């Protein structure tokens, strides 16, 4: 259980409270500048200037060293490609938990499963500098998953993803959501910033709706993704339709 109580970051994020349960997928939604990245950075433990309490199974986040943090959570921020050059498999090796409990056979099994799910098995010996934006993002995602994969790291509790689908095409995005579902099935809590509200409608167990640093509402996707509520926050027309018993949101 991850508990966030009265968390704030100056004027960028006003006090909010919520919980993240193991195996639960939480989407943070809202317009650009609403505080999504600020919230995720604070929860990751690397952000400065936050006030309030963030507890991982009762342990205060501020009391953890960076090494301990890396065992409990993985954080995929919005980031440019690194200046140094490595092959993909070397980069992924650096992503393994600092005190990996896995044997070589377990590491290889985890790498094989994650690489296949993200369709990067044929890229392990490529230079990271030669990858496209979508390929590089999938490699970064693989690294984050290796860091918190339960067979390699029994201390892992949380995966934090800041707009992970942004560089991905439609097919790659589908791979991403299957991977997130797999991570959640392993008992890891997942929290992610997301702009595709139809994906949120289908894949989120919990939704946090932010506007100008304020948590407007939270709850299930069905409770939060109400057209009237979304119109007020996003300042655009929203319509809900049903096709083959599946609900979709239309905008504009």
From Swiss-Prot:
Top-level class of the enzyme under EC nomenclature: translocase
Domain ABC transporter per the UniProt entry, residue ranges: 2-237
Chain residues that bind ATP: 30-37
Molecular function GO terms recorded: ABC-type vitamin B12 transporter activity; ATP binding; ATP hydrolysis activity
Documented EC number(s): 7.6.2.8
Main location: membrane
Topology class, membrane: Peripheral membrane protein
Highest taxon listed in the record's lineage: Bacteria
Cell membrane is among the record's keywords: yes
UniProt KW Cell inner membrane keyword: yes
Reactions catalysed, as given in the entry: an R-cob(III)alamin(out) + ATP + H2O = an R-cob(III)alamin(in) + ADP + phosphate + H(+)
Localization of this protein: Cell inner membrane
Alphabetized PROSITE patterns for the sequence: ABC_TRANSPORTER_2 (PS50893)
InterPro entries, sorted: AAA+_ATPase, ABC_transporter-like_ATP-bd, ABC_transptr_BtuD, Metal_Ion_Import_ABC, P-loop_NTPase
Cellular component, GO, one term: plasma membrane
Keywords tagged on the record: ATP-binding, Cell inner membrane, Cell membrane, Membrane, Nucleotide-binding, Translocase, Transport
NCBIfam families on file: PRK03695.1 (NF002981)
Quaternary structure note: The complex is composed of two ATP-binding proteins (BtuD), two transmembrane proteins (BtuC) and a solute-binding protein (BtuF).
Role this protein plays: Part of the ABC transporter complex BtuCDF involved in vitamin B12 import. Responsible for energy coupling to the transport system.
HAMAP family referenced in this protein's UniProt entry, alphabetically: BtuD
Family per record: Belongs to the ABC transporter superfamily. Vitamin B12 importer (TC 3.A.1.13.1) family.
Protein name: Vitamin B12 import ATP-binding protein BtuD
